[in-house]
Curated annotation (Swiss-Prot):
Part of the 30S ribosomal subunit. Contacts protein S5. The interaction surface between S4 and S5 is involved in control of translational fidelity. This is Small ribosomal subunit protein uS4c. The gene is rps4. It comes from Rosulabryum capillare. The lineage of its organism: Eukaryota, Viridiplantae, Streptophyta, Embryophyta, Bryophyta. It comes from the Eukaryota. GO terms for molecular function: rRNA binding; structural constituent of ribosome.
Amino acid sequence: MSRYRGPRVRIIRRLGVLPGLTNKTPQLKTNSINQSISNKKISQYRIRLEEKQKLRFHYGITERQLLNYVRIARKAKGSTGEVLLQLLEMRLDNIIFRLGMAPTIPGARQLVNHRHILVNDRIVNIPSYRCKPEDSITIKDRQKSQAIISKNLNLYQKYKTPNHLTYNFLKKKGLVTQILDRESIGLKINELLVVEYYSRQA
């Protein structure tokens, strides 16, 4: 399944707020939603499916990519669900988004693809690049690159930077300080339901 490129508001109306996908928050009609839910018996499969879809759309990855991350998480030590979230959160495109250097993860991915971003002083143009503690994230020393990201930082640094990241405005430098903990995830998600969804595939 390819990466979703359709209307983003339609997705968050169905799944809830997904800050990585869009910073828009649609106004929902509470009464009609409650009535719709009360008239339907939601299956356990659907509940797991929707949690899985939240991860996929929030992080902007394909079905195959998410399944691969689940398989990696299953082989790692610790809680499969927490390891899965750590793998997704440590992607370069997500790190750029969480630092406030881009308004959304698709926006961050575009910055990486267009070679605006350096990791440890080297250009990295792979959005899925897995960052690790002590990695530094900087902007290419080019006027266009600096202008784009400075504008984003002014608009989106209002969001709190998570505990595993820091950003130095004077040096225009982000730093991964540690592997994030569960409380720093910027998404309301039940990762155990996602693991259960893939239990027969991973």
